[in-house]
Amino acid sequence: MRLDAVIFGGGATGLWLLDRLSRDGHHVVLLEARSLGAGQTIGSQAILRRSRSSTSSSGLANRVLIVPHGLPSLWRDALLGRITPNLTHTRLRADCCHQWYVESAGLRVASPDNPLRPRFDAETLPPEERPSALADVSGPVVRLPEQVLCPASFIADLAAQYHDRLLKIDAERGLKFHLNSPGEVDAIQLASPFDGQKLELRPRQVIFAADADNARLRRAVGLSEPMQSPRPLHRVLARGRLPLLNGNCVESGRTIVTVISDVDANERTVWQIDGRLAEDGWKRESYQQAERVRQELTRILPGLNLTQAEWSTYELDRAECDADTGPRHDAVSVFCAGNVTTAGPTPFMLAPLVSDEITGRASSPYITTPFDPTPLANWPRPSIAPLPWNEEHRTWWTLGDQPSKDQQQPQRRAA
């Protein structure tokens, strides 16, 4: 089957790119070895942030997420159906975020040189307008014009639009590259993970957008591994009778906690706790990490009742392109060799930028007839990865329990 492009990786970047190339008239399919969104996308905070800076727990100053001015508006327009991709079926967790500030001794929040000073685009809230979870916070509370998406809903939205172009593969036993030379792919031989049926794809361009799996894919086509490093995170989940909250706590210029909340399959409120504690927590066992987070939440959210909450944790090696101590995420990383393009690991909301970068380099479609998915009709399709708190075999506990072996060992998720 001749194609303009084959995409490896069904995360935010791969799906956005699939939409863009398809709309531009390319004959393109996307291959996924696990589930759509598995790894980084499904557990993403999915906050459509504006530019902000923080100091990381590893001591790297000014780690900055630099977001182009028009990118939040692009996402908003897509969610409203004003532009493509049409994301009108993507669910919002919240239409805004909140940020609250913990004052350090001797530091006045109102001081112009104070790193705790609220951002220019933030609306300071009077006590009566604060979310219930922030009612007793002593420092400033601000509202940020940053929407929060449900990544599972985003994936489902695009997957429904391009179902006939999504293929489930067996990357270990059912994938073989035929090369003309290193980095020059002539054909891709697939064997169905269900019944072993064969399929040969002959693309003009091969695109790796598989985050941590890019290294293995590049080796398979004779290329060196990209310059990227795993960033270990140990995230904590809490569920129960919790208030809805989406936002960040800032102390001494550092985002110490990020909370996103949702409702699970049984209508319980779930919090995912991220930030500095997740970066530091990879050294701790699950029960210790959950207890550490509980203590911190009690400190920064006075009045929050966590006595009946259930807890769980998971570890994730989030792939990031290697960088020095300067700004990070200020540009997308795209590497080209032969007819292989590799998209470096990218934060959720920057997926459109990777798409623009790759499509800007792509040749015009060379197949002029309409795309015919008939040869793919009987091929298995990838499912959508469950949200971390909806995983079937996830272990939960209360912090008053004696920790079991499961609670001592974090549940690990591939990046």
Predicted regions and their residues:
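Short hydrophobic core segments
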Residues: V6-F8, E200-D213
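Active-site substrate-recognition segment that forms the wall
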Residues: W16, F208-A337
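Helix-loop-beta segment of a Rossmann-like dinucleotide-binding subdomain
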Residues: P126-D170, A187, E200-P203, R276-L277, ...
